[in-house]
UniProtKB/Swiss-Prot annotation:
Subcellular location: Cell projection, Filopodium; Cell projection, Growth cone; Cell projection, Dendrite; Cell membrane, Sarcolemma
Annotated segments matching region Mediates interaction with sodium channels: 67-201
PTM comment: May be phosphorylated.
Keywords noted in UniProt: Cell membrane, Cell projection, Cytoplasm, Disease variant, Epilepsy, Intellectual disability, Membrane, Microtubule, Neurogenesis, Nucleus, Phosphoprotein
Involvement in disease: Developmental and epileptic encephalopathy 90: A form of epileptic encephalopathy, a heterogeneous group of early-onset epilepsies characterized by refractory seizures, neurodevelopmental impairment, and poor prognosis. Development is normal prior to seizure onset, after which cognitive and motor delays become apparent. DEE90 is an X-linked form characterized by onset of refractory seizures in the first days or months of life.
InterPro entries the UniProt entry points to: Fibroblast_GF_fam, IL1/FGF
Subunit architecture: Interacts with SCN8A; regulates SCN8A activity. Interacts with SCN1A; may regulate SCN1A activity. Interacts with SCN5A; the interaction is direct and may regulate SNC5A density at membranes and function. May also interact with SCN2A and SCN11A. Interacts with MAPK8IP2; may regulate the MAPK8IP2 scaffolding activity.
Protein name: Fibroblast growth factor 13
Protein family according to the UniProt entry: Belongs to the heparin-binding growth factors family.
Composition-biased stretches (Polar residues): 215-245
Entry's Gene Ontology molecular function annotations: beta-tubulin binding; growth factor activity; microtubule binding; sodium channel regulator activity; transmembrane transporter binding
Function as written in the Swiss-Prot or TrEMBL entry: Microtubule-binding protein which directly binds tubulin and is involved in both polymerization and stabilization of microtubules. Through its action on microtubules, may participate in the refinement of axons by negatively regulating axonal and leading processes branching. Plays a crucial role in neuron polarization and migration in the cerebral cortex and the hippocampus. Regulates voltage-gated sodium channel transport and function. May also play a role in MAPK signaling.
Length: 245
């Protein structure tokens, strides 16, 4: 079967070559004004050669785009969550503060990264329940977004929770507008409730996930960059040993 197909193809090619030769002879013997059918055949041949001889340009694949929002997060305690230039996380009554703007970037099903618009720092929670900020996106920067009653939203760590009860560790502000330890915040209390105030829809590149071990300090598992350890562990505010327990 394969041999028959091959011989048929060879025969077809031979016939095609013979037709091209006869057409070329007719073109030479009978010149006329304007373009002849022979000229058109030549143009077609040249165009095919140019087409197949040229290198195809590789189209750049568009980078993955994630549809998120630029928003403010209004706490039920009466404060706007803010992430200041030095990495401090707290609440403020100043609605016009540019540090209250956050990028909410979807990184999974009902999972978001919370990034300060001005600082480009990510909110994160470590294995002890402390909130801190990170220049790089790590697993500690992932928060589960859950809608509570009256359209309030809670944000809990994706990787840390109470070992025995399984209760989540939540982002929260106390009545003074201070950041709280995640394991001290209960989801049914006002401290954990935030009301997003979306300003616009935005498209984001998918953050590059970095391993915690690359940036952890020995014995802590908390990434530290230019800020002090005490500052990182309490949202940017110094903390005594008694306050940390």
């Amino acid at each position: 079967m394969a041999a028959a197909i091959a011989s048929s193809l060879i025969r077809q090619k031979r016939q095609a070559r013979e037709r091209e030769k006869s057409n070329a002879c007719k073109c030479v013997s009978s010149p006329s004004k304007g373009k002849t059918s022979c000229d058109k055949n030549k143009l077609n041949v040249f165009s095919r050669v140019k087409l197949f001889g040229s290198k195809k340009r590789r189209r750049r694949r568009p980078e993955p785009q994630l549809k998120g929002i630029v928003t403010k997060l209004y706490s039920r305690q009466g404060y706007h969550l803010q992430l200041q230039a030095d990495g401090t996380i707290d609440g403020t009554k100043d609605e016009d503060s540019t540090y209250t703007l956050f990028n909410l970037i979807p990184v999974g099903l009902r999972v978001v990264a919370i990034q300060g618009v001005q600082t480009k720092l990510y909110l994160a929670m470590n294995s002890e329940g402390y909130l801190y900020t990170s220049e790089l996106f790590t697993p500690e920067c992932k928060f589960k977004e859950s809608v509570f009653e009256n359209y309030y939203v809670t944000y809990s760590s994706m990787i840390y929770r109470q070992q025995q009860s399984g209760r989540g560790w939540y982002l929260g502000l106390n009545k003074e507008g201070e950041i709280m330890k995640g394991n001290h915040v209960k989801k049914n209390k006002p401290a954990a409730h935030f009301l997003p105030k979306p300003l616009k829809v935005a498209m984001y590149k998918e953050p590059s996930l970095h391993d915690l071990t690359e940036f952890s300090r020995s014995g802590s598992g908390t990434p530290t960059k230019s800020r002090s350890v005490s500052g990182v562990l309490n949202g940017g505010k110094s903390m005594s040993h008694n306050e940390s327990t």
